[in-house]
Amino acid sequence: MKVFIQSIVAQLLLNPYIFWRGYQALPPKKSCRIPFILFFVLELSLYFFGFIFRNELPDNVIITIQYICNTWYIASIYITLSLLVLELIRLSQRIKPWFPKWMKGHWQQTKLTLFFLIVFGVTGLMIHAYHTVMNPIVKNVYITLPKAAGDRDSLTIVMMSDLHIGEVIGKDLVQKYVALSNAQHPD
């Protein structure tokens, strides 16, 4: 239930803010705004459909819904943070004007450029994160301790963090992590 409360907060607080700012940035053409509106309607519908019918839906369907909604949840956090940075920049402009004249003269184009910059930036970040999860790296760290440990001169330790094991990071991926861990031959 705690996870639902967290994600419902994101759905009901972050999505309207992202929608409002994105809608303002898009040109007032139906060809631009209708797909944007549909994206938010479909995502919200999918989220509530998955939540309401989570006990009745087959696992493969609910896991697919979780992949989509969890990905959007994380992306919406990054998008909101980006938008808040832009809000601070905009606030600084109101306090002490510093934007170049060409930017003020082409404000709609500037907003559209920032819209796509955020979309592509967050998309790139999400792709990189997915790649990192699917292809974990082994990093060797050598630590010298000033104390003697009996007759041992070395110790191999394997550490993994931030796995977030659940429906999305499931059994297959965990087995991959365990195999990678065992390949290091820990003591």
Regions found by a protein language model. Give the residues of each.
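Membrane-embedded segments
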Residues: 133-187
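Non-catalytic terminal accessory segments
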Residues: 1-134
